[in-house]
Amino acid sequence: NEAPSYGGFEGQIGFLMATGGMLCLMPDYLGLGSSDDVLHPYIHAESEAESGIALLQAVEILSDELGISMNGQHFVSGYSQGGHASMALARRMQEDPDAGFPLAGAAPMSGPYDMSGTQVPIGMTLESYANPAYLPYLILAWQQTYGNLFVDLGEVFQEPYASALPGYFDGETSGWYIDNFLDGPTSDLVQPEALESMMMPGHPFHDAALDNNVYDWVPESPMRLFYCTEDEQVFYENALVAEAWMN
């Protein structure tokens, strides 16, 4: 119920951005808001991009019905996971010109653009993570998407977490509640050497991380990357990797 369509704080950001004369689109992620019958495919570049294109197509139809004129300029931005999603969408808009939505500019902010080389590896080196719920969220979401990360969640998490975690990601339990449940050193949550094994080249989890890197392309339209050096959730090195590749 914190999705933009519910009119909360993030929805108000959309209204603020629209005051500059922009037509602002703020989609609910799949699995959030009213689409609560599926686990949100967290940090999944393909579905993020496809959802963005589908929303643009829907708004194009609606604008015709309402008689709203648009000038054909499309700008993309987002923060944190939204930074990842906006980067995925910007890449799709550039690489698929037949979709009909040319990219005028993008401003991804503090996104985990380099999942395989930065976000996951740095997170694995920390004694504890600022928001520990993100780790099972990522693993469960990628398991739903790819289907081959593990046979049993107990391969990754120790008890009682392995048995309890799937029930917590029900669309009703808040992130802070899951964070409190997982509060403690990462070594107390996961099986010994499980994360290191999953990040070995050739492991399905590592392959999924590679599949969801969104930095390895060169924008043909203006892009500005924003990041926070004290970000405890999405490490700022993601932006530095993206900048180095794109330049």
For each predicted feature, which ranges?
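Short beta-to-alpha linker loops that shape the active-site pocket of alpha/beta-hydrolase fold enzymes
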Residues: 28-32
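Accessory cap/linker subdomain of secreted extracellular hydrolases
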Residues: 109-216
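Catalytic histidine neighborhood in serine/cysteine hydrolases
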Residues: 243-247
